[in-house]
Each structure stands twice: as C-alpha cells, then as structure tokens.
Amino acid sequence: MIKRVFAIFTLTLLFIFVRPVFSLDTSSKTLEKYTKKISNKFTRTYCNTTKFGISYEGALAFAIGETNKEFKNNKLNKLIDDSLLKNSIINDLENNCQVYDFDISNLENLKFN
C-alpha cells in the first residue's frame, strides 16, 4: 500500500515538473549562415580597425576580442568547424579588404568555448 502511494506521488511529481525538451536546429544551412556571420563580423572589424590607422597586431587583437565577445554564448559554437571558419575569414579578408598576406595561424585565439 505504501509503495503504491509513494509510486503515485513520485509519478505525479515527475509529470508536474518535467519540462519539454526541444531539439536544436542544427542543419548544415544554419551552421553555414552562422559561420558566415562570424566571418563577416571579424572581417568588418579587422578592416575598419586597420583603416583607422591601428597596427595590424592591434587590429587583430581587437577583432578577435570583439568577435569572441559577441559570439561566445551561442549554442552553435560547439558545432562549427574551426578550419572552415578560419578559411572563410581568410577568403573574406582577401575579397573585402585586399589583405593577401594574412596567416591563418593568427586566428588561433579566435575561440568561443
């Protein structure tokens, strides 16, 4: 008798306090858009900072800091491909800022975890 009352009480509490779990939309299109958004943010920040006359090292540190700050709390950070992101940044720098000698190893501090 006590076992049944305890079981009913426990099941009632479980059904009352259980929250639904929603899946995270992680389609490849969503990840590509997110990667492009990060790449565009970094590129804009880096280009604008160098145009203001700040040194390349200072512009790099500022762009990495601003990009990390803006995107650090997004749930998609665990799912993005770092090499794809870095290559996208390099391509955007070449196409938008005409920076052709940017080394990919400069982006090692661009981390969101």
Question: Over which residues does each language-model region extend?
Answer:
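Alpha-helical interaction segments
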Residues: 5, 12, 36, 87-88
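Compact alpha-helical subdomains of small soluble proteins
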Residues: 57-113
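Processing junctions and N-termini across compartments
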Residues: 17, 40-41, 90-91
